[in-house]
């Protein structure tokens, strides 16, 4: 080893002036540099010591440069915890050498989450890490005892009159489509109605007056289900009081409003959401003609219910809820009343109130049957005028009219057994309907006809047979 070091010194002789730059750097090693110069000038230091000093200085520079970067990788300190380098050089333990060291003094840090650490950039801590509950410092100058045990909840402002009508009108109109009272109740609970609870029946009744009979039935059912959950019986009484006061204005848009409001009152008393003495409390105190008519209508309906008539039938069952037999009877009664009165508008109104546009072909069928069974011309002409009016007003559609005629065409052989002249009457009626524009030419051509029987004296083609004598 000494021989190799001597050869190295001979090849690269050490320059005393540049020794400080090659061996040490920094102010902390300035004293050691001057001592080495003196020792070299004294010519008593060995070559092996110089080489060892160079290696130690190089290791110290590397350690100082990579101390903060390589502190957690174990490149500088051995695995057994000793302060010895893998090359065998001892790590300097000078307090001044650790002054600018960024490594944690305890080896593990303070245990706090680091921003940009395991959770990612800008995240404090790893995902799912649970921190301790922050305890309130009572001695904190900003401490407020009112902030402890606070419960926060969303506060909905009460609706004013304008917002009330704007918010509830779509809800009630949508209810007329789906008929789910529970959904309406849930939506009303989310609103802060406040003192406007009594306005719910008023708005519902006013919208139902402009609708159909089925809408009024649904409104009565809605009021019955909402009473006790969203509003009380006193709210219902206040609402009907307001409806009676508003009857003069309601009658301008709906002339039948007094009778309809009376039916609503009778139904409410029957459902138990109005007390039985509600109508009696108005006796002798009503000056409005419309309000008096509404109360009289309610009194009549309630007196009829005592005789066994159900109060649920004040509106009837609308639309598809009715049975086929019931609809057939209603249409038959409608046609008979029309033949007696001759009022086409009333017949059209009664047909619309049935709310069965898919069953209008039954009216066409029954009307033609009456024509075939009649013996005079009045029924023929009145039924023709009725079908013409219903066709022009689009009350009966093309498909319903066509279906009614096709039913007659298919059943005319059986009808002819009871009505011998049905074929000829049907041909004449179909031709008149075509001339009036009620049916198309194609539908007219489908009308069945029965061939005329030839007499015995008629030959082929209608020619008379020549006499054989």
Swiss-Prot record:
Database matches in InterPro entries: ARM-type_fold (IPR016024), Initiation_fac_eIF4g_MI (IPR003891), PDCD4 (IPR039778)
Compositional bias ranges of the Gly residues kind: 114-125
Species this chain originates from: Pongo abelii (Sumatran orangutan)
PTM: Polyubiquitinated, leading to its proteasomal degradation. Rapidly degraded in response to mitogens. Phosphorylation of the phosphodegron promotes interaction with BTRC and proteasomal degradation.
Main location: nucleus
Modified residues (Phosphotyrosine): 152
Compositional bias annotation for Low complexity: 74-83
Alphabetically ordered keywords of this record: Acetylation, Apoptosis, Cytoplasm, Nucleus, Phosphoprotein, Repeat, RNA-binding, Tumor suppressor, Ubl conjugation
Gene Ontology CC terms, in alphabetical order: cytosol; nucleus
Localization terms from the record: Nucleus; Cytoplasm
Recorded domain comment: Binds EIF4A1 via both MI domains.
Name of this protein: Programmed cell death protein 4
Stretches for region Disordered: 1-38, 58-128
Single GO biological process annotation from the record: negative regulation of DNA-templated transcription
Polar residues bias spans: 84-93
């Amino acid at each position: 080893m000494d021989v190799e070091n001597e050869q190295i010194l001979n090849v690269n002789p050490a320059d005393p002036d540049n020794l400080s730059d090659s061996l040490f750097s920094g102010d902390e090693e300035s004293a050691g540099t001057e001592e080495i110069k003196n020792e070299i000038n004294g010519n008593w230091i060995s070559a092996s010591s110089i080489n060892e000093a160079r290696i130690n200085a190089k290791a110290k520079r590397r350690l100082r440069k990579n101390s903060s970067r390589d502190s957690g990788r174990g490149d500088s300190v051995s695995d057994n915890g000793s302060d010895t380098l893998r090359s065998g050089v001892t790590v300097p333990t000078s307090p001044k050498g650790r002054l600018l060291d960024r490594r944690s003094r305890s080896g593990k840090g303070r245990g706090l989450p680091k921003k940009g650490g395991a959770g990612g950039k800008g995240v404090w801590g790893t995902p799912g890490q649970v921190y301790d509950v922050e305890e309130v410092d009572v001695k904190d100058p900003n401490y407020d005892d009112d902030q402890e045990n606070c419960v926060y909840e969303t506060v909905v402002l009460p609706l004013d009159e304008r917002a009330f009508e704007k918010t509830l009108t779509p809800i009630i109109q949508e209810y007329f489509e789906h008929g789910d009272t529970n959904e309406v109740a849930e939506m009303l609970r989310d609103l802060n109605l406040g003192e406007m609870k009594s306005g719910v029946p008023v708005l519902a009744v006013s919208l139902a007056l402009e609708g159909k009979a089925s809408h009024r039935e649904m409104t009565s059912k809605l009021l019955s289900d909402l009473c006790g959950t969203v509003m009380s019986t006193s709210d219902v009484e206040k609402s009907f009081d307001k409806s009676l006061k508003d009857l003069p204005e309601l009658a301008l848009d709906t002339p039948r409003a007094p009778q309809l409001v009376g039916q609503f009152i009778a139904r409410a008393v029957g459902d138990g959401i109005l007390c039985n003495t509600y109508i009696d409390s108005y006796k002798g105190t009503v000056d409005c003609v419309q309000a008096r008519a509404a109360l009289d209508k309610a009194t009549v309906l309630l007196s009829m219910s005592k005789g066994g008539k159900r109060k649920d039938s004040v509106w009837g069952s609308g639309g598809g809820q009715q049975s086929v037999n019931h609809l057939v009877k209603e249409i038959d009664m409608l046609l008979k009343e029309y033949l007696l009165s001759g009022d086409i508008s009333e017949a059209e109104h009664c047909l619309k109130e049935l709310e069965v546009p898919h069953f209008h072909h039954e009216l066409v069928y029954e009307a033609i049957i009456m024509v075939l069974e009649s013996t005079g011309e009045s029924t023929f002409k009145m039924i023709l005028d009725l079908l013409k009016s219903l066709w022009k007003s689009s009350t009966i559609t093309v498909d319903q009219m066509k279906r009614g005629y096709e039913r007659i065409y298919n059943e005319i052989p059986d009808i002819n057994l009871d009505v011998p002249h049905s074929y000829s009457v049907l041909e004449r009626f179909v031709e008149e309907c075509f001339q009036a524009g009620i049916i198309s030419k194609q539908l007219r051509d489908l009308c069945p006809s029965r061939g005329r029987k030839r007499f015995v004296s008629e030959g082929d083609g209608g020619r008379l047979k020549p006499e054989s004598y």
